[in-house]
Curated annotation (Swiss-Prot):
Lineage: Bacteria, Pseudomonadati, Pseudomonadota, Gammaproteobacteria, Pseudomonadales
Annotated active site: K278, R352
Enzyme Commission number, as recorded: 3.4.11.1, 3.4.11.10
Keyword Manganese in annotation: yes
One Gene Ontology molecular-function label: manganese ion binding
Protein name per Swiss-Prot or TrEMBL: Probable cytosol aminopeptidase
Organism: Stutzerimonas stutzeri (strain A1501)
Gene (UniProt): pepA
Binding site for Mn(2+) 2: K266, D271, D289, E350
SUPFAM superfamilies for the chain: Macro domain-like, Zn-dependent exopeptidases
Length: 496
């Protein structure tokens, strides 16, 4: 998908479809009024028929209006001006996209420059529009014998005021990169687990390191992990015939000597629960348990597309959690890379086991801050549903940076407490720590566990169990979240 920014008049723009906003009660904005004048009042005449009222997401497609170079005009309702927020804006853009992607002509022009979205300037409004349109074109049909028909829509023209053109161009460029990262994340998540295993993810990382400059790859195999004393990680991977690994990607786009930011992703490519076996219903969706690792790779891809001037290290904790004669048992005690011992009471609480050793390994990079991303707990879905990611950590400034990034990127998170009182739930009579803390506050106690291994740097934990994929039905599939949040967080570190 190509995005082109122009400061041309809407009435003189040659395009297959010109998209114009329509406010509540058929209110035409300044741009739409100029188009109405150029077409000898054709818009006003069409509105008198009462086919559209301007409510959010309503559409009316008009053909062959006089005086215009556009073949069609699509009116899209934006509702009441004082109620148009990011959520409504998404509804508006998706409504337009639903129409234009089924039309011929190959292009469409958005003339939305006079629309005001609460809390968003022209840059932020445009960036969200481009992300929605690009992500809305996503198709996953790699394993279909009959592929989807090629999309007719190939180019989007973004009309803007001359004074805002530079900002809109930057928005389109950044949004396109984020959408590319989201698509990569979605592809990895949607792949079947017999294809996407730890070695496959390492191969994907290798291809990424070869495709872009400034990237260094290191894959820590199980032999190396044994040498490092990664007993918690190996306790998870030992039940599978697929060997586990920690994938380390270093991108040095910033100044030499600047400490890097670090992203750590949970990459459990299939989670049966191990000996603590999950129920069979819905287990197929446990291929998405590598959503944290996939989103870290997707974020890195967005960073590489933009060649951001930042130093970044990405670590993926990749393993399968399978039952077998060699699998870890409930009650086993292992020694982590940090030297702390863990009593494994439930083998289905495996994500924190691979993450704790990976978080310890991250210390050697002396990071400015570490953000780990994981489909960690079902409890987070109970608490926050599928709209919002859970956020916890040991540094208030970092937490606020991530919350703000989520708001800016329309990919929101919500902070949960990490009070010391919760730590007591992880007490074990036989080891330093247990890997579960009972039925209460599951998301919090999982983060409490990770906090034991993150004392040497500012750290935050994103629980994306509810946001990484859409469960069941025709819309089932990976979402690409939280690539927008993470990319925005890194952009803010540069711009800040």
């Amino acid at each position: 998908m190509e995005f082109v920014v122009k400061s041309a008049k809407a009435s003189t723009q040659k395009t297959a479809t010109l998209i114009l906003p329509l406010g509540e009660n058929c209110q035409l904005g300044s741009v739409a009024q100029s188009v109405d004048s150029a077409s000898a009042g054709a818009l006003s005449t069409a509105l008198k028929r009462g086919d559209i009222q301007g409510k959010p997401g309503q559409t009316l497609l008009l053909h062959g209006l006089p005086g215009l170079k556009a073949e069609r005009v699509l009116l899209v309702g934006t509702g009441k001006a004082d109620e148009l927020d990011s959520r409504q804006w998404r509804k508006v853009v998706n409504a337009a996209l639903a129409v234009i992607k089924n039309l011929g002509g190959g292009d469409a022009a958005f003339a939305m420059q006079d629309v005001q979205v609460k809390g968003r300037d022209s840059y932020a409004r445009t960036r969200l529009l481009v992300e929605i349109v690009a992500d809305g074109q996503y198709v996953f049909d790699q394993f279909k014998s009959k592929k989807a028909e090629p999309r007719a829509l190939q180019k989007i023209i973004l009309l803007c005021d001359k004074a805002e053109q530079a900002g809109v161009e930057r928005a389109a460029r950044e949004a396109s990169a984020i959408a590319t990262g989201m698509a990569f994340t979605r592809d990895l998540g949607n792949l079947p687990p017999n294809v996407c295993h730890p070695t496959f993810l390492a191969d994907q990382a290798r291809q990424l390191s070869k495709a872009y400059k400034g990237v260094k790859l290191d894959v820590l195999d199980e032999k190396k992990l044994r040498e490092l004393g990664a007993g918690a990680f190996l306790a998870v991977s030992q039940g599978s015939d697929q060997p586990g690994c920690i994938i380390v990607l270093q991108y040095n786009g910033g100044k030499k000597g600047d400490k890097p930011y670090a992203l750590v992703g949970k990459g459990i490519t299939f989670d049966t629960g191990g000996i603590s076996l999950k129920p069979g219903l819905g287990m197929d969706e446990m291929k998405y348990d590598m959503g944290g690792g996939a989103s870290v790779l997707g974020t890195l891809k967005a960073v590489l597309e933009l060649q951001l001037p930042i130093n970044l290290v990405c670590l993926l904790a990749c393993a399968e959690n399978m039952p077998s004669g060699g699998a870890t048992r409930p009650g086993d005690i292992v020694t982590t890379m940090s030297g702390q011992t863990v009593e494994i009471l439930n083998t289905d609480a495996e994500g924190r086991l691979v993450l704790c050793d990976t978080l310890t390994y991250a210390e050697r990079f002396e990071p400015r801050a570490v953000v780990d991303v994981a489909t960690l707990t079902g409890a987070c879905i109970v608490a926050l549903g599928s709209n919002t990611s859970g956020l916890l950590g040991n540094n208030d400034e970092l937490i606020q940076q991530l919350l703000q990034a989520g708001e800016s990127a329309a990919d929101r998170a919500w902070q949960l407490p990490l009070f010391d009182e919760y730590q007591e739930q992880l007490d074990s009579p036989f080891a330093d720590i247990a890997n579960i803390g009972g039925p209460k506050a599951g998301t919090i106690t999982a983060a409490c566990f990770l906090s034991r291994f993150t004392k040497k740097y500012p750290w935050a934990h994103l629980d994306i169990a509810g946001t990484a994929w859409t469960s069941g039905g025709k819309e089932k599939g990976a979402t690409g979240r939280p690539v927008p949040l993470l990319t925005q967080y890194l952009l803010d570190r540069i711009n800040g």
